[in-house]
């Protein structure tokens, strides 16, 4: 039997420093973690319920495709360190092959989270709000070994 391929498609409309739809100052793509932004909440829930085991066992190939939307959160185009810029146009398409699905706890205990900005943010949230024993630690984290943007850069 042929290997099944699944695609998740959506429109990214917000960029946070740990959202995949982000660029360095030179418009290079940045993170390999695909998990942030409310637009991915339903996507993560569906993957967890229906596909996580199959993705991790490599019995399906899973991809995420998104159109990068215009965003200007809080009238800021960069974070406090000036490291990230939101896309200025709706001309970029983001595509990633999902390589692994982990729980938040598994991710934070794995070497994949070492020295990553998102991991520091998660640790801060966990400590600040006492989330160690909460359902937050069971939320899934979607990892991708590679991804690309297609289209016009701002």
Residue ranges and their predicted role:
Residues 12-14, 66, 98:
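Hydrophobic side chains in beta-strands
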């Amino acid at each position: 039997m042929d290997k099944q391929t699944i695609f998740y498609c959506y429109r990214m409309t917000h960029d946070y420093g740990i959202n995949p739809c982000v660029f360095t100052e030179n418009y290079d793509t940045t993170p390999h973690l695909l998990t942030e932004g409310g637009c991915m909440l339903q996507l993560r829930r569906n993957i967890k319920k229906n596909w996580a085991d199959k993705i991790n066992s490599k019995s399906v190939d899973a991809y995420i495709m998104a159109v990068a939307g215009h965003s200007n959160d809080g009238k800021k185009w960069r974070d406090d360190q000036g490291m990230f810029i939101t896309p200025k146009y709706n001309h970029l398409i983001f595509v990633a092959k999902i390589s692994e699905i982990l729980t938040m706890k598994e991710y934070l205990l794995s070497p994949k989270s070492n020295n990553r900005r998102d991991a520091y943010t998660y640790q801060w949230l966990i400590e600040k709000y006492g989330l160690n024993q909460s359902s937050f630690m069971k939320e899934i984290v979607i990892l991708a070994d590679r991804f690309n943007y297609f289209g016009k850069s701002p």
